[in-house]
Amino acid sequence: MQAYIPQLISELKEFYGDDLYNLESYSNIPEHLEALAQRMHIGVRESHSFILTEISNYHKDYLGKKEVINPKEFSIDDCRQTIANEYGFASWTALNQQPNLLYNYDFEKAINFLLDGNLPAIRKVISEKPELLTERSKYGHNATLLNYAGSNGVEFWRQQVPLNLPEIVTYLLEVGADKTAIMKVYGGEFNLSLIHI
């Protein structure tokens, strides 16, 4: 399986490491995102360019302003707000008002199979659990599996493109994925219907 992974995304994935994938290590989503915010704060203090880029993509006060982020002044609360926004929540407070927010591990695995271009694994998991076609992310953006095929508007580290994306999208549509399914991103609601699929 192959995917186009921009260098920035590769660096992010390497930096966060297992914290991105070992979801079972956390009792709920807020606890997991707290761990990511703590890791981000380390990256800020170490002035990693890829972390500053991540922040400039999601923190409302720094959108497109990577050069004005001062690592010495960027607090853990700023990191929490960045992570909350990246994962589709309006604020860290809004995220933490949902302590029972739990992962659907099968859905998360299916997303990773999609983004890695592992069509055989996607076919297998969908045949075993067809409800994954209509499942929505527990993150604030509520993306479906097909929304993740858009490779944008979702978690920064997941913004990569499998080289066999057309085949994956064709398969998902053939087995019933809804191309009009809405996800909440960029301050509005969007779907993939504008893309000719």
Per-region residue spans from a language model:
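Short consensus segments that form the blades of beta-propeller domains
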Residues: 158-162
